[in-house]
């Protein structure tokens, strides 16, 4: 910690980079809170960028942790709206969101903003039909709205003229060179 404090005070970039590398090497989901606070204190943005990228690229793994369940609605929505998010399927993502919600039902106020970022249009018609039977989905009207929009997309797709929306776009990052 003394090296980090001195490096920050003297603005020795090479030493700060080494400290960032060291913190990144220690970073896990379990200790992220503490290490990210240290990185934030010393403006080690590479550490927070690394952690964000780690979550985005291993999101399915992240959803199995206590740290996922501890996210606020705005934090979760921030990850979900990112096109760099890697998920096995949007259905698996929906199920993870329901686990997150059931962990603390006071999050009902955040559920609309979180579900807004699920790409329901990428689910199959069978998956959408199953979701409409889900008790939680039936009681939360915004979810039904998103599902019905996705069903409309599939109907239009079958006719050959789908209206493309964020809900039907594949998650991908376009790099400019």
What is each stretch, according to the model?
Residues 1-177:
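Alpha-helical scaffold in the C-terminal half of BTB/POZ domains
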